[in-house]
Amino acid sequence: MMHIQTLRKITILDVQDKQRCLSTNQNVPDNVFQLIACWCYFPPFLSIAKIKPLIALKAGISENPVLIGCRRIKMAHCPYSEAMTRTTSVEDVKFEIPAWDNSNVDVADGSGRPESSTSGDTIRPKGRIRRSMTACNTCRKLKTRCDLDPRGHACRRCLSLRIECKLPETAERFQDNASMWSDATAAIPSIEERLISLERSMTEMTSMMRRMMDRSPSISGSSVSMLTRSGITDETASIEGSQSSSFAPRPIRLLQDLQSDFTGEANVLPADSRSLGDLFTKGIIDPKLSQKLIQLFVDHFGIWISVDNPSDIHNELRATDPLLYSTACLLASRYVPGIPLSVIHAMYLQIRHATVNVLWNKTPLKHETLQALALLALWPTAVQKETPMDSWLLSGISINHAIISFDFLNHAPSDLIVDNDMVAKLRVWNALCLTQLQSAIGNARPFHIQQRYLEHCPRLLEHPAATFEDGKIVAEIQLYLIALKLQNFSHRMRLGDFEYEEIERWKMEWAHLLKLSLWYCQLLLYRTAMRFHWESEHLISEILRNSRLILSKFLLVRFPNALAFPDQIYYIVGYAALNLCDFSPMDPLIDQVQTFLLHLSPNEDHIAYRFSYTITELKRRCATGPNPHNVVKGAFGDTRKLSMGQQIPFMNPLMDTMMGEYGGLEHLIPEVPPNSLPDMLTSVAGELQAFRTAIL
């Protein structure tokens, strides 16, 4: 075998000479066969320049009959014979180009021209494979690479130059275009249907707006411009002047009016209540009883205003801030049944008088004073014999004081870090905002807190000390904001929707925290929609369903927890019971709730006791079939009733107006004879002394 170094000395011209000998049937020198054998054994050691002539030489050997019978090339011993032959016989040996060879090499003859013809069955080396043309015209002209996505319709160069990308048509691109056009063709009918539906909806809305304008000729352009100049914007989150506000139900006002009508009380304060002094300094509540009341207050009410320890409310507060101290004792008195009603009544009158004076004090108010105002706004009906404090007015004025007193409200929510001091202020702020929302939606009154102030409410949850109750308050604030917005969009109520996208989004985040408030808001929305769809059976069924859910949930609460409920919970339960009386007076849940409320009430002045009687009386009158034309004067206010000229269908249910001509309830609620202030204080002192002897 010829040495590898000797093979490298063979030039291309020598091999080409041997090829010419083959073409003329001349004798081939021995070194040619040696070269071919070395190529079979050591192909990697040959350069590509020497391989090209060997390819042509191989083809010449297969054509020369003299060389076919030559046994000097022992292909059976060649390790690359499997890649070069198709059969094992020498006669049928056909040389193939190995896998490592370049199949696109052009074979040239001695003249330097590529060989273009073959003879017989000889497989000659193929020429350059013509690749499919995929580059666009621009890239081909520039002779650059065309960076094209296989599924794209333009290359990056054309996109960057913002010119048309002309691509050659290929089978794959043709199939993509065909599928795209087929999809577009299939979507055309659905698009046309949607357009027709939109046109129909626009026509209905236009006709509805025209009817509304015809029914309300008093609304002129000047009045609209006046509202615009008054500064009512979306930022204020106000609903004042909304047309649908006259259609919204007023559950708080309704329950208060029904209670007044059924009990026959005048709902006025005694004329001498303003001259009431400090009952604590007169010895009405001694230190031992006050300590017990403060401990009860911390256990059941302190979480609302960040009071976790009785030491947070010092005895010195009697002199420095008597309002918070008195409010704490008043709220805790419901947990001590032995305290005489006259004592509680005297405490309540003193607190009302102190509250009036505090609201007009010099600003800014102390933090303890704002805490007391927040508690009074949450529990305004501690005593039911007089007109309860208006929670909407009380919380509204307190919010204005809080804006002045709390510095963090004057900054963006992201500017400050929530520390312990800010947590205490945020709890008071959230309680005031929640009370304002509850009273606004419960009395169908406007809500004026600006959105930039409301954005501070959820910041309380960023602090590690945030509690489960803090999350419930934040969730309830957001829920009432959504309900208030929906309730006062007349077009949403006129559509009679049963599901609201805004509430569904709220459910995904907060539904696990609140149930009663959610059902209550849905109940209010359905009652509002019923003003425009009074014959809707689905609305009636939804009203009954939500009312039953509220009452069933309330019947599961524990007695200690029920006494600490804010007054809003009792309004929710009372309104749900009245709805059942209106549509299904024989529902057994009505009697169950009435009995449960009577069991919960610590005394006759508690809101649960009064609502229990109101529900019982309303059920009795609904079951006897009342005359809807005999209404109680002022039960809901003449300004709320719709005139016949409006021609808007609405229902005149028992929930809005109740029957009159009923006397007092001396058999159930004992009458307290009016006494002068000195006599009342003397009697209170005597009763308290007897209570101390028996209890303490």
From Swiss-Prot:
Signal peptide stretch: none
Annotated coiled-coil segments of the chain: none
GO molecular function, one term: zinc ion binding
PROSITE patterns: ZN2_CY6_FUNGAL_1, ZN2_CY6_FUNGAL_2
Annotation: DNA-binding region: 136-165
InterPro entries assigned: prtT, Zn2-C6_fun-type_DNA-bd_sf, Zn2Cys6_DnaBD
Region annotation (Disordered) ranges: 106-126
Gene Ontology CC: one annotated term: nucleus
SUPFAM superfamilies in the record: Zn2/Cys6 DNA-binding domain
Compartments it resides in: Nucleus
Xref: Pfam families: Zn_clus
Biological role stated in the UniProt entry: Transcription factor required for protein utilization and degradation. Regulates transcription of major secreted proteases including a serine alkaline protease (alk1), a metalloprotease (mep), an aspergillopepsin (pep1), a sedolisin (sed2) and two dipeptidyl-peptidases (dppIV and dppV).
Annotated family: Belongs to the prtT family.
Protein known as: Transcriptional activator of proteases prtT
Organism from which the protein derives: Aspergillus fumigatus (strain CBS 144.89 / FGSC A1163 / CEA10)
